[in-house]
A protein has these predicted regions:
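Charged, low-complexity surface patches
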Residues: 3, 130, 181
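Secondary-structure capping and boundary motifs in well-ordered enzyme cores
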Residues: 3-6, 103, 194, 198
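Active-site cores that bind ATP or allylic diphosphates and position pyrophosphate for catalysis
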Residues: 6, 10-169
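Hydrophobic alpha-helix position signal
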Residues: 14, 141, 172-173, 192, ...
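Scaffold signal of the M16-like zinc-metallopeptidase fold and its non-catalytic homologs
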Residues: 164-181, 185
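Extended, domain-scale alpha-helical bundle/helix-rich regions
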Residues: 180-209
Length: 209
């Protein structure tokens, strides 16, 4: 959140390139048009109009869900992520760090490639669930003149009825629902080790699968 002004400047650069626009379509209409590979009327606006609306957008003049910033991608692409995905949305809730300073917040596919480049990341390791998003993120990097990273993707092994997401686990631990990262009811490596299951057992299991 400390880089919001930088993210705003990159968003404005996309608008000036005529590669992003403010869209006022409701969620249902947007989903329907994207599904059918059709453009909405908002896409046809002039750059100067989008810049004016972007200014109002970041000043918080729109309600939540009233407007979003979308990338001009390829509405006929077989990869639906490329069909004018949302880059920014309005969120009025108070931010734990920035308070009420910002009202327009970036989506994952926008801030992720920018932050990776700003931090000098050269290698990305992530699970295959993000595979469809690589095309959009590389497209953004090309438009914004950002460095690309080498990406290594891997399969993900899930255990039914258990969560392995760090954010969710942290919240449950902080709320007191679980005693800690080694709570035997969890399936973290620490918890499994406490139950006598060593990490090498999972390496062998994955090999067999």
């Amino acid at each position: 959140s400390d880089d919001m002004e930088i993210l705003y400047s990159y968003a404005e650069k996309l608008i000036n390139l005529d590669k992003a626009y403010i869209c006022f379509c409701d969620r249902e209409k947007m989903q329907d048009l994207r599904h059918n590979g059709k453009e909405c009327e908002c896409r046809k606006k002039k750059v100067k109009d989008n810049l004016k609306e972007w200014s109002d957008f970041i000043k918080g003049k729109y309600k939540e869900g009233e407007a979003v910033l979308r990338i001009k991608g390829d509405m006929k692409s077989n990869n639906h992520v490329m069909r004018d995905s949302v880059l920014f949305r309005i969120m009025k809730a108070q931010h734990y760090r920035q308070g009420n300073k910002y009202h327009a917040w970036p989506m994952y596919d926008f801030y992720n490639p920018i932050e990776d480049s700003l931090m000098g990341v050269t290698l990305i390791l992530r699970s295959n669930e993000f595979d469809m998003r690589v095309e959009l993120q590389d497209y953004l990097k090309d438009l914004l003149g950002l460095n690309k990273q080498k990406i290594i993707q891997y399969g993900r092994f899930n255990v039914m009825e258990f969560t392995t997401k760090g954010r969710e686990l942290r919240e449950m631990i902080e709320s007191g629902e679980y005693m800690g990262w080694d709570d035997p009811r969890l399936i973290t490596l620490k918890a499994l080790k406490r139950r006598g299951i060593v990490k090498e057992s999972f390496y062998e299991l994955v090999k067999q699968i």
